């Protein structure tokens, strides 16, 4: 039986709305599929917007934790108060493009990815096994077309969406290594390496990787630092409350 780990990280966005989609596309709730999560949460934020610059919904109340326990049935989960990372890399953070994702949001994501994959690794070590496939994704991911069974994917590769590069990727030179930050999967060892972006961030920044997008930093860590074999796919999906459909 193929064993799969779904690893959620980030803010608890659109969890109820995307539940069935994740059941249909990733087997959420099946006996061979386990859930791990590192989620930012502070009940004081209930009802406020996740972000002020783009519409991503509002922070849920504490009842979401009970819902997650009853429906996701996570093997391990950590809720952490949102942290600020603005104090990091104040002198050598180099976007290299006129529009940039907030540094704090980017580093927060790298931190969460590392934390949730570490939870998965702890469970593997405690039970002396490795998952066949590990999926790292946002809670508000909504697939429009089924990506196919995970067993069809080579577990020795990192699987990501095939982004058509825009001028920002082309002119900054990141088109050769950048990978979309919304979702990725592969074998357990592959995803362990994928998750080391936060650990390797000082090295990545010192080597002058453009920092205007987390796609560049994640890809730099995967390809330049960890030498992962990356395979890109023409999946079709969107962020639940977003207007953009990702497709080729």
Where are these regions (language model features)?
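N-proximal low-complexity "stem/linker" segments adjacent to membrane-targeting elements
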Residues: 1-17
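Short acidic, S/G/P-rich loop/turn micro-motifs used as interaction or catalytic elements
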Residues: 11-16, 43-44, 142-144, 190
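Short alpha-helix within the catalytic core of nucleotide-sugar-dependent glycosyltransferases
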Residues: 19-20, 121, 144-154
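Short, acidic, metal-binding catalytic loop of nucleotide-sugar glycosyltransferases
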Residues: 20-33
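A short beta-strand-loop structural module common to alpha/beta enzyme folds
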Residues: 32-43, 233
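Active-site-proximal specificity loops/subdomain of glycosyltransferases
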Residues: 38-127
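Catalytic core and acceptor-binding pocket of nucleotide-sugar-dependent glycosyltransferases
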Residues: 103-119, 123-129, 142-146, 167-174, ...
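Short aromatic/hydrophobic "clamp" motif used to bind/position activated sugar donors
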Residues: 134, 140
